[in-house]
């Protein structure tokens, strides 16, 4: 199910595999890769993950999550990590990905645009959605990314 990830690097960053998560249907969780984002000298500067497949839960949670540590923000590292993950998703046969963020999270919205996503909608979360129930969130920006023609590091 899981593939080799050694190719997930470019001149600026590399993704170091930290953990693999199997699917958990009872919790509506998909199989996932979890990575540390490292800069060109190997210093950890953040993290990201790729959740495989498509479902209602992933429509709202997204296929990719990312976080860049404060001192390293503003350099497009999250967008560059997303672009590397696009190739891994393609190798899993995925033709598109969804990335979501809160409507007031302007840095994340800019990351989605930088990585080539198109805003599909600002969706209201279903009443029973975990992000609504547990975190009090009500809406998500839904960005769609076509994987046709995407190559690692592009």
Language-model region placement:
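Conserved acetyl-CoA binding element of GNAT-fold acetyltransferases
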Residues: 59-70
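Conserved active-site alpha-helix within GNAT-family acetyltransferase domains
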Residues: 104-121
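Conserved catalytic-core motifs of GNAT/GCN5-like acyltransferases
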Residues: 100, 118-135
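Conserved GNAT acetyl-CoA-binding A-motif
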Residues: 89-100
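Short hydrophobic/aromatic beta-strand or adjacent loop that forms the aromatic wall/cage
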Residues: 32-34, 136-143
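Conserved G/P- and acidic residue-centered "switch" motifs that form tight phosphate/ATP-binding loops
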Residues: 76, 93, 105
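Conserved acetyl-CoA-binding loop-helix of GNAT-fold acetyltransferases
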Residues: 68, 74-88, 110-114
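Acetyl-CoA-dependent GNAT
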Residues: 2-59
């Amino acid at each position: 199910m899981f593939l080799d990830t050694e190719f997930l690097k470019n001149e600026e960053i590399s993704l170091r595999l930290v953990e693999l998560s199997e699917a958990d249907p009872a919790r509506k969780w998909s199989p996932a890769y979890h990575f540390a984002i490292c800069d060109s000298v190997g210093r950890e500067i953040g993290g990201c993950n790729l959740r495989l497949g498509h479902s209602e839960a992933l429509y709202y949670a997204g296929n990719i999550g990312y976080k860049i540590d404060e001192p390293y923000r503003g350099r497009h590292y999250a967008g560059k990590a997303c672009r590397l993950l696009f190739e891994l998703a393609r190798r899993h046969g995925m033709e598109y990905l969804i990335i979501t963020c809160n409507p007031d999270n302007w840095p994340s919205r800019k990351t989605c645009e930088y990585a080539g996503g198109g805003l599909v909608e600002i969706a209201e979360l279903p009443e029973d959605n975990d992000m609504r129930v547990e975190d009090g969130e009500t809406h998500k920006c839904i960005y769609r990314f076509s994987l046709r023609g995407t190559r690692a590091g592009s």
